[in-house]
A protein has these predicted regions:
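Short, compositionally biased
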Residues: 40-51
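Glycine-rich anion-binding loops of enzyme active sites
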Residues: 1-41, 177, 188-190
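Glycine-/charge-enriched secondary-structure boundary and capping motifs
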Residues: 2, 52-68, 72-194
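Secondary-structure boundary elements
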Residues: 21-22, 49, 84
């Protein structure tokens, strides 16, 4: 068994903790490349109960190859944006999904309104949903659904931020906005599976 940890150090004034988030900011999705590190208990149970899932192919890969893709590293593409005044928040989408992670960086008087219909759901999640007959609410709570990181930025910075990320092959896109609220993430719309 292999176990690893990473520890980072950052100057306090450079921490991107969400405290600069403003009403009207946009929420960007940075795509994931698969399950990353979450949802494996559900997937393992699914493989035990429905072993035929192992015969599935996902975008030319076996099901096992698709679920075992290494977690994408976002550091190289993000480091050039650190220190940018218009970058107000970052949330890594892990267990708890968008709702359970984006809310952690929201100021107390604000909420994020996210249209899940805008999420570019990866095909692997469609296979998991189909075999497990998993409700969308559970899919959104368990998996990243194709969103590895959410980024909160001023709308005026959108062209510069997306152009920067595109240089690294990352096609970031808008999934929501910051509104008045109570530190919650409001999910609207309907997931669209490929």
């Amino acid at each position: 068994m292999l176990n690893a940890s990473i520890l980072g150090v950052v100057d306090k004034e450079r921490i991107i903790d969400g405290s600069k988030i403003e009403i009207g900011d946009v929420v960007l999705a940075l795509p994931s490349n698969g399950l990353h590190t979450n949802g494996y208990s559900l997937v393992r149970k699914l493989m035990e109960e429905k072993p035929e899932i192992l015969k599935e192919t996902v975008e030319g890969e076996s099901f096992l190859e698709a679920i075992l893709k290494p977690h994408q590293c976002y550091y190289q593409m993000l480091k050039g944006l650190f220190g940018m005044e218009e970058l107000h928040g970052l949330a890594h989408i892990t267990g708890g999904g968008i709702e359970g992670n984006l809310n952690r960086i929201l100021p107390a008087n604000m909420s994020a309104k996210v249209d899940v219909g805008n999420i570019r759901v990866l095909p692997i999640f469609g296979v998991i949903k189909r075999y497990g007959q998993v409700p969308d609410s559970d899919m959104l709570r368990t998996f990243n659904m194709g969103v590895g990181i959410t980024m909160v930025v001023k709308p005026s910075a959108l062209p510069a931020v997306t152009a920067h990320l595109r240089q690294f092959g990352c096609e970031a896109y808008v999934i929501g906005e910051i509104v008045e609220g109570n530190q919650t993430v409001v999910l609207e719309g309907q997931l669209q599976y490929p």
